[in-house]
Curated annotation (Swiss-Prot):
Increases calcium current amplitude through Cav1.2/Cav1.3 channels in rat pancreatic beta-cells, which is a prerequisite for eliciting insulin secretion. Stimulates insulin secretion in NIT-1 insulinoma cell lines. In vivo, significantly decreases mice blood glucose levels as of 45 minutes after treatment, similarly to insulin treatment. Has a potential therapeutic use in endocrinal pathologies such as early stages of type 2 diabetes where the pancreas's capability to produce insulin is still effective. GO terms for cellular component: extracellular region. Keywords: Cleavage on pair of basic residues, Disulfide bond, Neurotoxin, Secreted, Signal, Toxin. Transmembrane segments: none annotated. The keyword Secreted applies. Expressed by the venom duct. This is Conotoxin Cl14.2b. It is found in: Secreted. Residues 21-48 form a propeptide. Its main location: secreted. It comes from Californiconus californicus.
Length: 67
């Protein structure tokens, strides 16, 4: 097995451990501290700062970023 294949296999095995979304979903992002948690909040709640509708909200019931 050459080095490239070994590297790709190692990358595939370690990807779930380094996935920020999975870490944030399981323990609130505490593993990487406040920076990771803030990045998650930007991803999750950016629509509220922009005063847009949340993805789960029907547009007819949306008002200033909240349902």
């Amino acid at each position: 097995m050459n080095v490239t294949v070994m590297f790709l296999v190692l990358l595939l095995l370690t990807m779930p451990l380094t996935d920020g979304f999975n870490i944030r979903a399981t323990n609130g992002g505490e593993l990487f501290g406040p920076v990771q948690r803030d990045a998650g909040n930007v991803l999750d709640h950016g629509f509220q700062r922009r005063r847009e509708c949340p993805p789960r909200c029907p547009t007819s019931h949306c008002n200033a970023g909240t349902c």
